């Protein structure tokens, strides 16, 4: 660097108000300085502004003097830090390091949660570059059911042991009642285009086959098989065949009644509204039944539904199904197929589910999210949501409440 120039970092703090940044940079503009870096944050109307600039040495004294007077007039604090060429070059060299986004989400965020998470990042050699809040300002009344808090940490570096870090974060999420997502910060994170959902216990808060079984008087038998399958203890296809056989003779009208009263999962309406508004393609890939999937398709404008079709003859279930069973392997095939049809890279896909048969598609998708999932699924997933509704997915995609609310209330 030219020895006639020098680098100076200024840090300004104080009560924020319109025009403050303009006033500071106007002073700098009198000396035609080069801005090398600038960052600003506002927390509870308190400003923190940092500017790194290069100026002629002969001007530095006058610049600092004028800035001191300006800061006094504005009622803010200002400090000056000289930056050596070596320090600056070292800072520039770090820009080639890997970047990640760690999203923390919950009904509320506590100092204990943030301490635990940031300690793990430090142990892994990761540095936090920035932190921002994605959710709106929190009310003091914590009793409100729709309250949630989310922050996004931009971190830099390469984890020393990615698998160990993932395990530790997942353990914390269970112990401290919070959700997290750790994603590479690249172009695909901002360009997700296809999202595939499991249906039962994900989009809806029930297992449809259990509802049918109750009406058929075989609830206990079917429920036991369902739970065993979702835990991954028995093959899904085998369990499905056993359960469907127990429904033989049930009247078709029962399915209509159940469909009209499906308990929709918290946050689904908001999530679907936003996804459709921003042009995402949406699919249901379910080990449940097409009858209920198509009902949700009409309700929310879902683009694709792949599930299992029950055979019905003379208005009665026969105890058999038509076509291939949609199991974990089939969900992967369908995700690939839809991505190909939509001309979407697999890295641009999202998969959300709760059961063992969802794990293959969660692993394949660019972003796989376990939602209120079984322990085996949570243990093998890279992202999970357990504390809030399904619209928590939006925060993992980087959406901010303030940004969404500008485009319509939910």
Regions found by a protein language model. Name each.
Residues 20, 113, 203-206, 358-361:
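Short glycine/serine/threonine-rich phosphate/pyrophosphate-binding segments
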Residues 249-410:
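C-terminal cap/substrate-recognition subdomain and adjoining C-terminal extension
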Residues 1-192:
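A conserved regulatory-domain signal marking ACT and ACT-like small-molecule sensing domains
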Residues 187-237:
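Active-site neighborhood of HAD-like aspartate-dependent phosphohydrolases
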């Amino acid at each position: 660097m030219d020895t006639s120039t020098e680098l100076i970092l200024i840090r300004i703090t104080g009560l924020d108000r319109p025009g403050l940044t303009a006033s500071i940079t106007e002073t700098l503009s009198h000396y035609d300085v080069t801005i090398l870096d600038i960052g600003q944050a506002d927390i509870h109307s308190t400003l923190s502004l940092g500017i790194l600039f290069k100026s002629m040495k002969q001007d530095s004294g006058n610049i600092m003097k004028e800035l001191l007077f300006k800061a006094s007039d504005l009622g803010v604090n200002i400090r000056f830090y000289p930056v050596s060429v070596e320090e600056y070059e070292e800072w520039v060299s770090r820009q080639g390091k890997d970047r990640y986004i760690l999203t923390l989400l919950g009904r509320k965020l506590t100092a204990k949660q943030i301490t635990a998470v940031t300690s793990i990042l430090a142990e892994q050699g990761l540095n936090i570059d920035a932190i921002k809040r994605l959710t709106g300002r929190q009310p003091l009344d914590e009793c409100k059911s729709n309250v949630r808090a989310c922050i996004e940490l931009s971190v830099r570096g390469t984890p020393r042991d990615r698998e160990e870090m993932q395990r530790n974060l997942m353990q914390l999420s269970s112990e401290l009642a919070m959700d997290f997502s750790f994603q590479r910060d690249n172009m695909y994170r901002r360009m997700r285009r296809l999202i595939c959902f499991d249906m039962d216990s994900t989009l809806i808060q029930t297992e449809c086959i259990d509802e049918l079984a109750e009406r058929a008087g075989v609830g206990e038998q079917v429920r036991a098989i369902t739970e065993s399958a979702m835990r991954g203890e028995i093959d899904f296809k085998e369990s499905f065949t056993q359960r469907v056989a127990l429904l033989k003779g049930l009247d078709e009208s029962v399915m209509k009644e159940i469909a009209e009263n499906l308990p929709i999962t918290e946050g689904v309406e908001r999530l679907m509204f936003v996804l459709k508004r921003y042009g995402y393609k949406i699919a249901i890939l379910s080990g449940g039944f097409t009858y209920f999937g198509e009902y949700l398709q009409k309700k929310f404008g879902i683009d694709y539904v792949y599930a299992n079709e029950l055979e019905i003859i003379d208005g009665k279930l026969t105890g058999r199904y038509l076509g291939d069973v949609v199991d974990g392997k089939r969900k992967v095939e369908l995700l690939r197929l839809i991505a190909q049809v939509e001309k979407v890279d697999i890295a641009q896909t999202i998969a959300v589910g709760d059961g063992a048969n969802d794990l293959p598609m969660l692993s394949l998708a660019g972003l796989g999210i376990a939602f209120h999932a079984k322990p085996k699924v949570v243990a093998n997933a890279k992202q999970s949501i357990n504390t809030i509704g399904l619209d928590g997915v939006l925060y993992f995609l980087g959406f901010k409440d303030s940004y969404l609310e500008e485009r319509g209330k939910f």
